[in-house]
Swiss-Prot record:
The lineage of its organism: Eukaryota, Metazoa, Chordata, Craniata, Vertebrata. It is found in: Secreted. Disulfide bonds join 265-288. This is Carboxypeptidase A5. InterPro entries: CPA_M14_CPD, M14A-like_propep, M14A_act_pep, Peptidase_M14. Binds 1 zinc ion per subunit. Residues 138-431 form the Peptidase M14 domain. PANTHER family: CARBOXYPEPTIDASE A5, PROTEASE FAMILY M14 CARBOXYPEPTIDASE A,B. It is an enzyme of class 3 (hydrolase). Residues 34-126 form a propeptide. It comes from Mus musculus. Its cofactor is Zn(2+). Its EC number is 3.4.17.-. Belongs to the peptidase M14 family. GO terms for cellular component: extracellular region.
């Protein structure tokens, strides 16, 4: 399946031949187990101008597809990070050299980091079993997270409940934690993590924050004020199919796992599937692209479930979607360069959130609107939230800035979560103090 993502369809094959090829690839993948990334590297390029950015974008459209952008070509001031398969390294490096594009190697061998990550998880799992505990400083599988959710809700039923909001494409439960001190249809705050399945630090951060809420309530006067007036909803695994796949087969899978008749590349980018500038810049109509938008807005059950839930609730005041990596706090719009009506308020709130975050461990984040800070992105969740009347809509990009990328070591889970919590609390406090 990684092969179809890297290479797209083979030209000149009949539909039957294509199906046969894909079936053979599937059998081989099952036989071999997880996709191996030995020798794959992450290269960083700093484009000097728009022409060089265009040359980098051309790499993604080549067949076979030669690169997987971790930080795509956006603007000359931002570095471009791309994973290059070992087999494509000579041709990609030659391409860069021929066009005067200087590069550095951020990750020399991806598989080395993956092996370290897997070993750390195995060690943590043995310790958890021997002590009958759950480690908040380790990465976990989907089954482990869902089991933790059940235990967590049972232990803290006075403050937390579990809500089933729908089913994924592969029929997995989509679960949301509700933190509430009671009262019907109160003003609410939405937080989601893991919409892109390979961003494991976000799931781990969502788990840690959930535990922080129950531990701090009653001790933290700011949190107590928030929960005495508002409810907090956290969706820890927004893309359960993709997340399960990152553990079973392809650690670097980004999209969900939906398929369509007659289309042989799998998955939709769930953060391009919302009804907010759908199909515009920063999304892709090619099903083999990592930013494939899907056939229609809200076509994906994982997106539709959130839309139906938030719309049905009708009283959400803030929506925060947590991603990695790049160390940013951003607000709408992604699909337009036009500033939103309360741009100044969101700018100042993002600034305050970044200040609060920085005080914890000294980590520097940047902030601003999505389209001016990161890149143009259409059909994204926070744009939909803002257009739906949710005034305080933010997107976070957590650690780091590229040393590890999506493969952030587990040793950074707790510090990342601690600083993220302070930024979140800043936004929640502002939302509480500025009702609308």
């Amino acid at each position: 399946m990684q092969g179809t993502q890297r290479g797209g369809l083979v030209p000149g094959l009949s539909p039957l031949d294509r199906r046969t090829l894909l079936f053979c690839n599937f059998i081989l993948a099952v036989a071999w187990g997880q996709v191996n990334f030995t020798g794959d590297q992450v290269l960083r390029v700093l484009a000097k101008n728009e022409k060089q950015l265009s040359l980098l974008r051309d790499l993604e459209t080549q067949k076979p597809q030669k690169v997987d952008f971790w930080r795509g070509p956006a603007r000359p001031s931002l570095p471009v990070d791309m994973r290059v398969p070992f087999s494509e390294l000579p041709s990609v490096k030659a391409y860069l050299k021929s066009h005067g594009l200087a590069y550095s190697i951020m990750i020399k061998d991806i598989q080395v980091l993956l092996d370290e990550e897997r070993d750390a998880m195995a060690k943590s799992r043995r310790l958890e079993r021997s002590t009958n505990s759950f480690s908040y400083s380790s990465y976990h599988t989907l089954d482990e997270i869902y089991s933790w959710i059940d235990n967590f809700v049972a232990e803290h039923s006075n403050l937390v409940s579990k809500i089933h909001i729908g089913k994924s494409f592969e029929n997995r439960s989509i679960l949301v934690l509700k933190f509430s001190t009671g009262g019907p249809n109160r003003p609410a705050i939405w937080i989601d993590t893991g919409i892109h399945s390979r961003e494991w630090i976000t799931h781990a951060t969502g788990i840690w924050i959930s535990q922080k809420i129950v531990n701090a309530y009653g001790k933290d006067h700011v949190l107590k004020r928030i929960l005495n007036t508002m409810d907090i909803f956290i969706e820890i695994v927004t893309n359960p199919d993709g997340f399960a796949f990152t553990h079973s087969m392809n650690r670097l899978w980004r999209k969900n796992k939906s398929s369509q008749p007659g289309i042989f590349c799998i998955g939709v980018d769930l953060n391009r599937n919302w009804k907010a500038g759908f199909g515009g810049n920063g999304s892709n109509k090619n099903p083999c692209s990592e930013t494939y938008r899907g056939p229609a807005p809200e076509s994906e059950p994982e997106v539709a479930a959130i839309v139906d839930f938030i719309t049905g609730h009708g009283n959400f005041k803030a929506m925060i979607s947590i991603h990695s990596y790049s160390q940013m706090v951003m607000y709408p719009y992604g699909h337009s360069l036009e500033p939103v009506p309360n741009h100044e308020e969101l700018f100042n709130l993002a600034k305050d959130a970044v200040k609060a975050l920085n005080k914890v461990h000294g980590i520097q984040y940047i902030f601003g609107s999505i389209s001016t800070t990161l890149y143009s992105a259409s059909g994204i969740s926070v744009d939909w939230a803002y257009d739906s009347g949710i005034k305080y809509a933010f997107s976070f990009e957590l650690r780091d800035t590229g040393q590890y990328g999506f493969l952030l070591p587990a040793s950074q889970i707790v510090p990342t979560a601690e600083e993220t919590w302070m930024a979140l609390q800043t936004i929640m406090k502002h939302t509480l103090n500025h009702p609308y």
